[in-house]
Amino acid sequence: MSITKKPNDTMKAVEIVKFGGPENLKLKLRNIPKLKKGEILIKVHYAGVNRPDILQREGNYPVPKTASDIPGLEVSGIVVDREKSATKYPVGSKICALCHGGGYAEYVAVNQNHCLPIPKKLSLEEAACIPETFITVWSNVFLRGGLKKNESILIHGGASGIGTTACLLYTSPSPRDDR
């Protein structure tokens, strides 16, 4: 399929057929989401797996009423359509996005303000973890927390997605001079 060709009406999506382990995730046919004001339609190439997705699958995280029942909070992919007021990313753009659920599907509709262009040095696969994990750590540790060069940080749960990202960002050379 050409990246500029609009998809058919249906898509494959992962549904939680009953609460429990991963064996309760099944591939089903669903309608492609209709675009609302300011939204873009992304052909999903990769989706991150995050703790809320697991909790949702286990029945320990009720889906907000305005969110999709399809798991998946962060994705990377290519813009295939956009609502007329969504002008930030042209069709064909490679982006990553923070979703209000729905990432475990072939297509997801996301507000354009929840999307980021993918840095040229990153693959679609690598970029899928930017919206939820990387941005969460960066905004909380460096922007809000103000962590500076030669300061220490205690990272609880260093083996989680957020914890691993925090460890990597803390020990990496910073693009910012003040870290």
Predicted regions, residues:
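Basic/polar N-terminal segments that are highly enriched at the extreme N-terminus
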Residues: 1-11
